[in-house]
Amino acid sequence: MRDFNNAQITRLKVRQNAVFEKLDLEFKDGLSAISGASGVGKSVLIASLLGAFGLKESNASNIEVELIAPFLDTEEYGIFREDEHEPLVISVIKKEKTRYFLNQTSLSKNTLKALLKGLIKRLSNDRFSQNELNDILMLSLLDGYIQNENKAFSPLLGALEEKFTRLEKLEKERRLLEDKKRFQKDLEERLNFEKMKLERLDLKEDEYERLLEQKKLLSSKEKLNDKIALALEVLENTHKITHALESVGHSAEFLKSALLEASALLEKEQAKLEECERLDIEKVLERLGMLSGIIKDYGSIMHAKERLGHVKNELHNLKEIDSHCETYHKEIERLKTECLKLCEEISGFRKEYLAGFNALLSAKAKDLLLKSPSLVLEDAPMSEKGAQKLVLNLQNSQLETLSSGEYSRLRLAFMLLEMEFLKDFKGVLVLDEMDSNLSGEESLAVSKALETLSSHSQIFAISHQVHIPALAKNHILVFKENHKSLAKTLNNEERVLEIARMIGGSENIESAISFAKEKLKAQE
């Protein structure tokens, strides 16, 4: 690719969909035109490509896409790459249900879409649902233009975004504080009750386990006492065994040591049992019940103690709530004043440079044979972008009443400005029948715009007219053979024949071929 930091789809493989039994296409960078007779499966091919990215339902039993996208952060999703420029492989397998994989790692459809968000930008006749020409985009374009013209503008935008984000955070915290203030009395009562309950219990982290052990000992005290007493009685006569061993010349030191250790352990357990005799079983069970309730409510004794500390801190903050509210109020008013001042400065820049930006937009629109649109600044509620919005003025037309061809060309005009001033789109453009219902002159204008965009982004465009295929770097033909749909990348001779077909069908084939050769030669 010309800009290898941008995304590039290098291969598409499809198995068994409604049109293609088998499809395997390799792609290059730049503009790829997709042509073919009506009904052969051009839109199905594009739908398969979009299905791999989760933008459409999968239309095949298996779709596989190889993709280069060095800027994608795949490690967040557990997919590690030694080389960020190595191809990623997206696989979609459809059986009883549809499953998605990235480099053989299974992902949900939503996770895949989140990872690949913004990687594919699609222009089609269903354009208004995408709400692409919104005031956020238009304001970003104007700001990008100003930043390109005047280096003093960018620090203002950065400062406003930082201060406004801080302002929003403080306002949210103040609202929470004011909510607490409204219910301060009730909240204090509840927190004091919880504090008193936890303090009265005097919680110790190992107490619950110790009481459980005591309960266990109490439940089997008599049986254990008898067994320990009998064992100790037996151990009193074990000296006879050691004496006998020594008298016949064998060492009894190991046995003596083991018997002494056993005696000590049994005496220790006997002491525990004697201590249990002084315990009140009812009090032990009552305390265990209380601690069980605490563990159920807080998860553990440790968490309950942490909660007690938090409650004490909350009670302290409630006593200081009026002081905190006043501090928040002063800081918020200070930030508002600073943000408004920045908004005024930003507004001044926008007013100064709007005419120049409108001139550029009009020039792009004129190249695409559109009436000159213009952008008008209007006041808007303050945000991190300022206190203005841009409204698109289409002379005597409304955005909603534009034909699909007019809208697509207008969108192309803005995309050309995006490429020039924002430079933030690193994905792939997919264009569905951009030149349908256009005049030859309009189609030529669209093809030139796409050629310019293809210097920055890989583009796939279904085309019904000759201009896009003639200017395209790659030409893919979808056709039928023996009632089966196939697709292939055309060489130069095949491109001439396909463009000739698009020009004149089967009639006047010689003149059509001659014209096709001229079109291809002109773009070399």
Swiss-Prot record:
BP GO terms, sorted: DNA recombination; DNA repair; SOS response
Keyword Magnesium appears in the UniProt entry: no
Signal peptide positions (record): none
Domain of life: Bacteria
Binding positions (ATP): G36, A37, S38, G39, V40, G41, K42, S43
UniProt record similarity statement: Belongs to the RecN family.
Protein name (database record): DNA repair protein RecN
Origin species: Helicobacter pylori (strain ATCC 700392 / 26695) (Campylobacter pylori)
Lineage of producing organism: Bacteria, Pseudomonadati, Campylobacterota, Epsilonproteobacteria, Campylobacterales
